[in-house]
């Protein structure tokens, strides 16, 4: 389990994160939700070590934040010019002692042989996104961190993406992801955390959130003319 205790972060005297305390449980799929500017990406950057925090502490009892155990998909996907998809795969495979096969990589991306031989920067936005996701899986990570993973994907590709996530969950991969799509949160999350104005406003299982949620009914009077 990864424990964050009283994490705070500010930029130019503006509090982006304020006293964040959460647990990212092993073998659990956790959704981090919130509107744009809520601090989700900043929190992700702090967890993976790309950003320093002003105060607080992070305890990684399972050593999941080891770079060889962690796969990361950042919010923005960019590839260098003139490097082919197959070359990217071989490059990423060289970083690990154990890694997914060429066949497994093609299953995740659903790329044809022609696309595997194509320059990555020439793929469509959705194809680049699924490629970036597949590269995050090359080293068979125990922890997967995904920042807005399905942005730029069409409906069919998003469906395939979540089918892959379901298989990873069955293999007990620990997953933390951010999303704006409520159906993805309802379908995949074991735990939901809502970040708003730099603070955790909600941290619970989806079924408990549904059970405790209150609904309002608004009656609007209408007059009909005969």
Regions found by a protein language model. Give the residues of each.
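ABC transporter nucleotide-binding domain
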Residues: 162-226
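Hydrophobic anchor residue at the start of the ABC signature
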Residues: 133
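Conserved structural motif at the start of ABC-family nucleotide-binding domains
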Residues: 2, 17-19, 67
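The feature captures the beta-strand-to-loop junction immediately N-terminal to the Walker
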Residues: 33-35
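Catalytic Walker B motif of ABC-type/P-loop ATPase nucleotide-binding domains
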Residues: 144-148
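Conserved ABC ATPase signature
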Residues: 119-123
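Conserved ABC transporter NBD signature motif
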Residues: 49-68
